């Protein structure tokens, strides 16, 4: 579960290494974000020469959460870290590669480009 001030890794090759959540999108009372939700975040650490710069405000979609959650079929899934992928205004990823596994829930949220770039979908 991601909320304001949560820090997470970046799972793409935009050059950003760490994000800090500023806002969870989806209404004024929305407090938590899980897999497939969109957030507004700022880049806290970045590699030099990358397209994402430190201090830049970006949109990102959550691809992994450390908190375990139950799927409708009864299975439970939990990842080792919190991670997000930086997206543009149209919802397409800014990077050209995605690192690490992503959750199957992204397919239901219509993030097909992220699903196709990911090395593993759990």
Swiss-Prot record:
UniProt-listed Pfam families: Ribosomal_L14
SUPFAM superfamilies recorded: Ribosomal protein L14 (SSF50193)
GO molecular function, one term: large ribosomal subunit rRNA binding
PROSITE patterns named among the record's database cross-references: RIBOSOMAL_L14
Any one Gene Ontology cellular component term annotated for this protein: cytosolic large ribosomal subunit
GO biological process, one term: translation
Keywords from the named record: Ribonucleoprotein, Ribosomal protein, RNA-binding, rRNA-binding
Key word Ribosomal protein present: yes
Annotated InterPro entries: Ribosomal_uL14 (IPR000218), Ribosomal_uL14_bac-type (IPR005745), Ribosomal_uL14_CS (IPR019972), Ribosomal_uL14_sf (IPR036853)
Chain segments annotated as transmembrane: none
Domain of life: Bacteria
Purpose of the protein: Binds to 23S rRNA. Forms part of two intersubunit bridges in the 70S ribosome.
Family: Belongs to the universal ribosomal protein uL14 family.
PANTHER family on file: 50S/60S RIBOSOMAL PROTEIN L14/L23, LARGE RIBOSOMAL SUBUNIT PROTEIN UL14M
Oligomeric form and interacting partners: Part of the 50S ribosomal subunit. Forms a cluster with proteins L3 and L19. In the 70S ribosome, L14 and L19 interact and together make contacts with the 16S rRNA in bridges B5 and B8.
Stated name of the protein: Large ribosomal subunit protein uL14
The species this protein was found in: Herpetosiphon aurantiacus (strain ATCC 23779 / DSM 785 / 114-95)
Gene assigned in the entry: rplN
């Amino acid at each position: 579960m991601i909320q304001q001030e949560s820090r997470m890794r970046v799972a793409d090759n935009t050059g950003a290494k760490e994000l800090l959540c500023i806002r969870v999108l989806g209404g004024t009372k929305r407090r938590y974000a899980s897999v497939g939700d969109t957030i507004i975040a700022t880049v806290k650490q970045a590699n030099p020469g990358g397209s994402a710069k430190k201090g830049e405000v970006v949109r990102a979609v959550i691809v992994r959460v450390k908190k375990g959650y139950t799927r409708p079929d009864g299975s439970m899934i939990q990842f080792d870290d919190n991670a997000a992928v930086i997206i543009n205004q149209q919802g397409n990823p800014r990077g050209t590669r995605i690192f690490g596994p992503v959750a199957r829930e992204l397919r239901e949220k219509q993030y097909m480009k992220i699903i196709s770039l990911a090395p593993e979908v759990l």
